[in-house]
Each structure stands twice: as C-alpha cells, then as structure tokens.
C-alpha cells in the first residue's frame, strides 16, 4: 500500500511543519510518503523539505477574497487543506492529514486501515454542528434555519486537526462538492473548513478515539491535568481565545522542550532509513487508567456538552416548531 502523511503551512509556519514531520519520523516511524501543502511559500524556502525527500505541493485557499471577514476565527490559509480531496490524491491508498500545530508521539499506522473517512470528535466545548456556525447579524432566524435545512444542528462534529481517509472515497465529484459547500456557507462558519467538511461528511464519518487529537494545553492549563499524565498518539495545540502559552512553540508552554527537541532533530531526518517507532503504552491497564483520568478531568466539559445539546434541541423547537421542520431527527 502507498500511504501519505500531509500537513499544511505558510511561510510563517515552516518550523511548525518541520517539527511535525520530525515527530512523525522519529516517534511514529512513518514509512509512507510525506507531503507539505505550501501556501504562498517562496520556492527557495521549500528547498529544505525537497532535500529531505518531502513532497511539496502549492496550495491556494478556496475563494480567498471571500474570506477576509472578521467573522472568521482562523486564517484563511487553513482552507487550503481541502486540496487533499483532489482526485490526483488517488495515487495513494490512504491519506492522513495532521495540522502543523500537533506533536505526534506514537505510530499512525492504524489510521491507514480506515475504510472511508475518520476523525476524532471535536473538543467538547464546540462538538455540535450548531456551535461550528456563526449567524450573521443581518440574517433572520428563519433564513439561518433554511440554510441548514436537512442537517441536525445537534449532531456531534469532528475536529479537522487530524483526519484520515481511504482514497476510494475520491472521485471527480468530491472536490467540486466541497467547493459548492464553501460557496454556500463561506460566511457562516466559526472555523471555516471544519464546518464545510462536517457538512460534506455529515453522518458519513467514523469516530476515532480522542487520543488521536488530544488538546494537551487545554487539559494542562484549563483542567489542571499534570503534564506527565497527558499522553496520546497526537497532541494538538490549537489557538484558544487568543491566550498566550497554549501553543507548544511558546517558550512558557509545558511542552515547549518536547516541541523544540523535535524541531532540532528535523535536521537528521533521512527517509531512506526509517527508525523504529515509539512503543505506545506498557499495557492495557495503563491505557484504561489513562482513559478514565481523561474522562474525570473532562467531567465538566461532558456535562456542558450534553446540557448544550438539550438547550439547542429546545431552542430549535421554538424556532422551527415541534416537530422541527427541515431538520433530521436526532
């Protein structure tokens, strides 16, 4: 099988991409291909990746001029990740996308066995479809509801920081289908490409364990989980409410030394000689203990998650009538 590991970066995120590839190489022992989706990166700045044997592909955001709105939380660059659904990616059997603000600690090989499309559930504070959306002030409630006719806004959503898919899902209609969703919902997403992908793969995705997309700084800073108790296949460090110290490359972040060590070792990447991957956990007992510690730490988040679902159901009934029109039953 031919498998591909992809990340995305602009010229300001190249160190993050190097660290990501280094962690995949040294920790996961990844034996497939590596690719950088490069957004507006000068050719000479891509030379390092090419010399390492990492594939590079120029990627432009979809409808860039439409996204210069302060409604969007994230840079338009991230919309370029949708290019992985282009038909020419069928030359690989499976594709794994990992955001460059992640650290990979353990093998990703299990993801290559994905039959369709897989991702981990979004973090509990925003894990419903409605919480991925933004209703413009000049849009009425009925117009907003009509936009999402056919979707259950209470539905659980996935996070796009890591996802994997079997390229059997790719055909000539997938990328145009995503483009169509982008056009229709370009001003309605808090996290643009995440909303679009959740609409496209609505009820057609397989949930991965949270350990494939663990929000490490959130657990450590917001839920007081000791750093040494935070372990997963992939640690994710997304921006959160513009707070400092949550990104793994911030020098005051608890995971900075790990991130910096991976970045320094990027210079030693040799894709002709893949190291043995890290062993994951010493046994099932340790794994079970880790899962329960995580659930206990997130008990408030789980409670909030289910409360939000109940509140949303009640609100939708009030807006749409009971039973709700144009919305799939939960």
What is the role of each PLM region?
Residues 33-40:
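Short internal beta-strands
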Residues 1-3, 7, 153, 167-330:
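A glycosyltransferase accessory/donor-loop signature
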Residues 1-22:
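N-proximal low-complexity "stem/linker" segments adjacent to membrane-targeting elements
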Residues 102-140:
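Conserved donor-nucleotide/metal-binding helix-loop-beta segment in metal-dependent transferases, i.e.
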Residues 98:
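Catalytic metal- and UDP-sugar-binding loop of GT-A-like glycosyltransferases, i.e.
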Residues 44-90:
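Active-site-proximal specificity loops/subdomain of glycosyltransferases
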Residues 95:
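Short aromatic/hydrophobic "clamp" motif used to bind/position activated sugar donors
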Residues 23-31:
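Short, acidic, metal-binding catalytic loop of nucleotide-sugar glycosyltransferases
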């Amino acid at each position: 099988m031919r498998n591909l590991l992809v990340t995305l970066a602009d010229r300001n995120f190249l160190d993050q991409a190097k660290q990501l590839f280094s962690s995949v190489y040294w920790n996961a022992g990844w034996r497939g291909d590596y690719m950088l989706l490069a957004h507006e990166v000068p050719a000479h700045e891509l030379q390092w990746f090419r010399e390492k044997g990492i594939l590079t592909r120029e990627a432009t955001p979809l409808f860039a001029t439409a996204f210069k709105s302060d409604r969007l939380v994230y840079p338009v660059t991230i919309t370029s990740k949708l290019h992985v659904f282009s038909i020419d990616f069928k030359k690989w059997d499976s594709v794994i996308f990992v955001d460059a603000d992640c650290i990979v600690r353990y093998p990703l090989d299990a993801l290559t066995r994905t039959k369709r499309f897989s991702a981990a559930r979004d973090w509990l504070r925003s894990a419903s479809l409605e919480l991925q959306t933004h209703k413009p002030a000049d849009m009425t409630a009925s117009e907003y509801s009509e936009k999402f006719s056919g979707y259950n806004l209470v539905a659980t959503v996935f996070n796009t920081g890591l996802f994997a898919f079997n390229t059997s899902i790719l055909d000539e209609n997938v990328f145009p289908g995503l483009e169509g969703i982008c056009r229709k919902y370009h001003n309605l997403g808090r996290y643009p490409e995440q909303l679009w992908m959740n609409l496209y793969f609505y009820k057609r995705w397989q949930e991965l364990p949270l350990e494939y997309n663990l929000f490490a700084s959130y657990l450590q800073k917001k839920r007081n989980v000791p750093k040494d108790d935070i372990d997963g296949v992939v640690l994710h460090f997304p921006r959160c409410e513009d707070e400092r110290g949550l990104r793994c490359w911030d020098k005051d972040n608890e995971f900075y030394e790990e991130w910096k060590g991976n970045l320094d070792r990027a210079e030693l990447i040799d894709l002709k000689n893949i190291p043995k991957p890290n062993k994951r956990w010493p046994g099932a007992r340790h794994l079970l203990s880790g899962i329960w510690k995580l659930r206990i730490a997130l008990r408030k988040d789980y409670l909030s998650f289910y409360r939000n679902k109940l509140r949303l159901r009640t609100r939708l009934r009030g807006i749409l009538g009971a039973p709700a029109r144009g919305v799939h039953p939960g």
